[in-house]
Swiss-Prot record:
It catalyses: 1-(5-phospho-beta-D-ribosyl)-ATP + diphosphate = 5-phospho-alpha-D-ribose 1-diphosphate + ATP. This is ATP phosphoribosyltransferase. Its EC number is 2.4.2.17. NCBIfam families: hisG (TIGR00070). Lacks the C-terminal regulatory region which is replaced by HisZ. CDD domains: PBP2_HisGs. GO terms for molecular function: ATP binding; ATP phosphoribosyltransferase activity. It is an enzyme of class 2 (transferase). It holds the Pfam family HisG. Heteromultimer composed of HisG and HisZ subunits. The gene is hisG. Pathway: Amino-acid biosynthesis; L-histidine biosynthesis; L-histidine from 5-phospho-alpha-D-ribose 1-diphosphate: step 1/9. Keywords: Amino-acid biosynthesis, ATP-binding, Cytoplasm, Glycosyltransferase, Histidine biosynthesis, Nucleotide-binding, Transferase.
Amino acid sequence: MLTLALPKGRLAEESIDLMISKGWLSAKPDPDSKELIYNDPLGKIRILLVRSQDVATYVEQCAADAGISGWDVLKEGGYDLATPLDLGIGKCRLSLAAPEGYTLEARHRKIRVATKYPNLAREFFFHKGLSCEIFKLYGSIELAPLVGLSDCIVDLVSTGGTLKANGLKELNIILESSARLVFNRSSLYGKRKEAAEFMDSLSKI
């Protein structure tokens, strides 16, 4: 049996649907249940439901054999994990956005940036040769430039609807993201038969 860490929310739902279609799960966990561990009757997969930012930590520390996490989260955290498979679900992009009329150029002061992704944001501005001040926020990132907290934001974008609704414009795409299957190296070796079968099955989408 493989223990799989999944992020709560839409990505978990997409991942579970995929595993059901591939015969690794027999049914969806009860949506009304408060339990965070789901043992599927087929006995192939045990699911841990965790915060999206915590999936990689559970896998890296061997509390789970594998996990499904966004590429944005994995790149931001710099985890030591095997990332053998892009599942092609949960697609979005990490972008720089700012109010209409804002241009990205060298200024007399640091560019103020609000984001949940300080490492990726800092790396982007470094490669642009621009100095920045990062404000790490945990939600409602689009609000920051509207109230003067920041000049711009670095955040995930799916359709761009939220940006448009708040008068923001996408300036640069920093990273294309999608859901990745990740393994800790111990499980990838110790459970290599199950891991190989799981990866092979999910790769045939």
